[in-house]
Amino acid sequence: MGYAYRIDDQHGVYFVTFTVHQWVDIFTRKIYSDILLENLRYCQQHKGLKIYAWVIMSNHCHLILSTESFKLSDVIRDFKKYTAKKIYQAIENNESESRKQWLLWLLKKEDHIWFWEEGYHGEEIRTKEFFDTKVDYIHYNPVRAGIVEKEEEYLLSSCGDFYGVRKGLLEIEPF
């Protein structure tokens, strides 16, 4: 594992990116993004995960997070492993998935499910200025992708919480 992927301070605040293998557009289907959200909630409730900002795009997600009681690298490892398995199973069981055979072929190598790209590009956040830069980057992602005109319009994001537009889909923490 390279230096860019290391978590030096297991209880520090980090900006991370999880990318779907081969940048496959999987989270265009609500069933799969819901699995991601459910597992993030589980980690918040049972593993002490704190989420400060987040966005789920079609083929990746960005989060700013930390943890209190568990090692952050362990929580990330378990999260990626569990969501990979659950999303792969959801694809297998989804009769209406038009890309089913192709996705199953692409996301499995030998006997191993390969849903996520390796690593998570963790960057430790130590200052409010760097935090604000990363929050802006996260929330503007759907605008850059041409999905929405204003970042607060995108539902799979913490932006609504930040602007006070709506309660988001995940609990977020103040920095």
Residue ranges with predicted function:
Residues 1-175:
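Short catalytic/metal-binding and nucleic-acid-binding patches
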